[in-house]
Amino acid sequence: MEKIAAVIVTYNRLALLKECLQAVQEQSKKVCSIVVINNASTDGTTEFLETIDDTRLVVKTFETNRGGAAGFSEGISIATRQGADAVWIMDDDTIPQSDTLIKLVDTMDNHQDAGFVCSKVVWTDGSVHMMNIPGYVSHDELCADLYAIRSASFVSLLVPCKIVREVGLPYKEFFIWVDDAEYTSRIFKAGYKGYLNNNSVVLHKTGANYGAGIKVATPDSAWKFYYYMRNSMFASRGERPWIVWFFRHLNHLRLDIRRTKNMPVEVRGAFKKNLWRGFVDGLTFRPTVDYVSDEES
């Protein structure tokens, strides 16, 4: 697998984007292109990207913030149309080591059944990042530091473009959250294998090592839980009989609302409102898969 395109989605995190880009440019396995989707940043990102002297850089700037999901969908589409063999997907706060990519590529090349391969994601203290623990098929090693997985995050994920063309793009309508889990699960359900290479390591440079659950939610993140509930409901649709699916998510809603009791009174209502809205909209939310069109510009 020779031609690897890096796909980076960014929004108002210029300092982290600079670190991410430098780390991508310094890979021992050189990428053929670096596709940056700028989600209408207002912190100088647009101006900074205009100063970069690298012919591999491809920048698409949205006029409005369309969310990470639309950014990844657009970036993967651009890289695939430009003839890459695979896309290496990451957020702007992902800092790869110099050999991160080559180790992903080696795993992909040695496993013809691979639909995606992800890196081990750590926080600044070297501990495993709670936000990016993949969905394991088994916790048993297949071989040294290689594990079978069924889902992974968009924090250092390698996907062959032939599979992108087959299964389509991530749902841009998700806006944020669950887009990566749904997409990798879709590839897995199409009959391909997923792998975690623990020797391929990236730093996820968040402010703290936290997961995505409501137990660790910050007061200003209430709006995100609308997308969490709605997208989670869609992603699991069809896995069980409708009535089981309905009551399963109704129970999740009940438990999450109960967990808001530990939150400050002034933000509790916002969390409840967004969870309820997400649940109601999740009953009818039905986005359709977009496929790569080579006629697009």
Model-derived features with residue positions:
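Short, acidic, metal-binding catalytic loop of nucleotide-sugar glycosyltransferases
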Residues: 22-31
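A conserved acidic beta->alpha catalytic loop
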Residues: 23, 38-47, 64, 94
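Glycine-rich, basic loop-to-helix element that forms the pyrophosphate-binding segment
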Residues: 62-82
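Short beta-strand-to-loop acidic/aromatic patch adjacent to the donor-nucleotide binding site
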Residues: 84-93
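Conserved donor NDP-sugar-binding/catalytic core segment of glycosyltransferases
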Residues: 99-129
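Non-catalytic, C-terminal membrane-associated alpha-helical segments of glycosyltransferases
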Residues: 114, 241-297
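A recurrent flexible, glycine/aromatic-enriched loop bordering the glycosyltransferase active site
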Residues: 140-159
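A short, conserved alpha-helix in the catalytic core of glycosyltransferases
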Residues: 163-168, 173-206
